Amino acid sequence: MLGTFQHSSLRIEVNAKEADIRDSLLRPSQLQKWLWPQQFNQGLPEQLQPGLTFTSSLGPVTIQHYVDVSQPNCLRLLLSQGIDGFHEWYWGEGWVQSRLEGISILPLNLGQTISLIQLREFLVKKNIPQT
């Protein structure tokens, strides 16, 4: 694998319920709405389950994801191809934590930061009452 070893752990506060955070991370239909510009392959199940393998692309870079752990407050993805490593998510009422480690030519810390900001914005918009 070409690239450098990178690792990053970030935790943010979000004005959202644990259930909304969980749905945003474990349901591919929700994940695709906020994790732009990353594109996921078609035909994903309603919810990420252990043992599932899927791919995403970020421009010309393809990333393979293997769902190692999928629990009510934790998601662990083993990554290969464009990133050789793992991505862990933990969450609770009002907070999300992301830990990313891997070898890649991509700037993982920057991507992780942008993803968390996008998730927070998505959750804020989702929780605005419709009039």
Question: At which residue positions do the language-model features occur?
Answer:
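Hydrophobic ligand-binding cavity/cleft-lining segments
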Residues: 1-45
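A general secondary-structure signal for short beta-strands and their flanking turns/coil
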Residues: 3-7, 51, 84, 93
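A short, structured loop/turn motif at beta-sheet edges
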Residues: 15-19, 68-72, 90-95
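Glycine-rich portal/gate segments that line the openings of hydrophobic small-molecule binding cavities
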Residues: 13, 32-36, 40-83, 99, ...
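Beta-strand/loop substructures that line and gate deep hydrophobic ligand-binding cavities in soluble
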Residues: 74-131
